[in-house]
Amino acid sequence: MKRRLVKRRWLGLIGLVVILTGCTRAPLGDINQEDLFSRVERGEALEASFEPYINQAYQPEALAELLGEEVLTGEWFMNNNDDQVGYTLLSGYKEKNSTQAIQLFAYGESEPEPTTVRVTISQLESGDDVSEGEVITEVTIDNVEVADTFDLTTVTIPELEGVYLYRLESLTPTGEVTDRVLSVFYNVLPKLDLAFEVEHDTGTEATWVLHNHGQTSVTFGVDYALEKYDDGVWREVPLDLAFIEIAVQLAAGERYDNDFSVEDLARGEYRLVKTIQAPDYGESFTLQAPFLIK
């Protein structure tokens, strides 16, 4: 028996689409029917001026463009898989007063020259234009040699709620910056606001849409379950589909569209059921998108 591959359209992604291997029927597992909603909202909105920085929290080069700075010259830190020094980013949601390790590691076969490394955390201040405010943490370590993965230093996440800029820099003996990595983290959860719906029913094909109205990115696959309302009970409809295994990261303020076939469905009330992960919240949410076949 042939299995149809799900068609997909990509809209508003922030650049991370991880292609895995093979196909799967991807069962969603046990679903708590009482927890199914078409829209989920959590948290309070941060200042709108922070949104571009939150969206690019894991993207050093995009942050550099926002700040008008130069990053990842390849002089010392890994860039485009050059054999240099690897690093971990301090990005996304971090709990207040938690301790975070700043790690470095040798990448490839090169032996980077020992250098001075500076770690800086400063608060971003909102306004018409976001600006870099007070320096909260600054640590300088001389003569850093990198071999295996090791903890360069540890930092404590500030208690004051806000959005913060993290800098990891290599320096010359005179203090000139030769290479720089930037990221953004925040110790208050950005607003989560997701809506799931079915639209554009042509009689043979419809489109499910995930709207990210919030301020934090979410991740999901293209798999879903289809259910039909029958005698007061939602019953799963078997799907003759092979879902391609991919992970999609959807930025705040964007939407994702995916077409699916409805030509073989009898008249009645249906819903799509789909699970979305919200990494900043450390939770998964199962959403429903009702629709009618007339």
Question: What is the predicted function of each stretch?
Answer:
Residues V233, Y270-R271:
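Surface-exposed, secretory/extracytoplasmic low-complexity segments enriched in Ser/Thr/Asn/Gly/Pro
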Residues D128-I141:
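A surface-exposed loop-and-adjacent beta-strand signature within N-terminal beta-sandwich domains
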Residues A26-V130, T154-R235, D240-L241, L250, ...:
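Primarily secretory-pathway and cell-envelope proteins
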Residues V139-V163, D240-E269, Q277-P279:
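Short, solvent-exposed, Trp/other aromatic-anchored flexible loops in extracytoplasmic proteins
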Residues I19-G22:
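C-terminal motif of bacterial Sec signal peptides marking the signal peptidase cleavage site
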Residues K2-L11:
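Bacterial N-terminal signal peptides that target proteins for export
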